[in-house]
Amino acid sequence: YEVAPSYEDADAVIVNTCGFITPAVEESISAIGEALDATGKVIVTGCLGERPEKIMERHPKVAAITGSEAVDEVMGHVRELLPIEMDTFTGNLPVAAPGMRPQVDRPQREDVAHGDVFAPTVKLTPRHYAYVKIAEGCNHTCAFCIIPKLRGLQVSRDAGAVLYEAFRLVAGGTKELMIISQDTSAYGVDVRYRESEFQGEQVRAHLTDLAVKLGEMGAWVRLHYVYPYPHVEKVVELMAQGKILPYLDVPLQHASPTILKAMRRPGAGRQLDTIRRWREICPQLVERSTFIVG
């Protein structure tokens, strides 16, 4: 199969959705409708796919709906919608059609060896930056958040798999690696920080160890969705040393102790003390956050 640059050139469309907040749900529903109008053949996947009734009440003509990280299931539906032309002499080997080739980062031997189920298949960002997912899911039970229901509990990738992916991206021209997960600070907790191989070395699945290795690759390393765990201080020290970008995306969400308690979130005072300490270690630190007003 080939990735098409527009609806006009596509035989089917896969819509990757978000079901986290109402505007994202509406945007996803709108995108599904737009794709249906353009091609008539639409497969819906992603977070909103975990709530199929929400999709079917607005768009009952979608071809299929899957949940998050359902790559094999999505591809099964693609094959049903668009059977591949088979060559008589090569059996099940697909015949390549002329046209545009996607920019593909196929799972390599190292990914398979580490059981890496999150290895990307198609890179959709511009060449100069890329998102690198290090884990999927979340172990927290915040009162307001639907993520654990949509994404499940945290599953961390092996450090070796993450580093091999990052290495290939940088070798291919990527200048900035954006590290993402639902809870980046908790990376490796679920696998007890197990070690895996990267270029002949054993590396722990731990945020500090991962940051050290990523910082040696010659690209900007930007950390997203970092919560103020104690070990993040070590990561801030790496920032002060110029190893990774002095940037943290920290979702603090509110300043009221009463509201935070109702949200089942840590207290504001403790978080502010942590941030002050980070700034003492790395004065050039830039922090991005989101807050509820009211």
Where are the regions a protein language model picked out?
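Proteins enriched for Cys/Gly/acidic motifs involved in redox and nucleic-acid/cofactor modification
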Residues: 1-187, 206, 248, 269-277
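Conserved SAM/AdoMet-binding glycine-rich loop
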Residues: 42, 51-52, 171-294
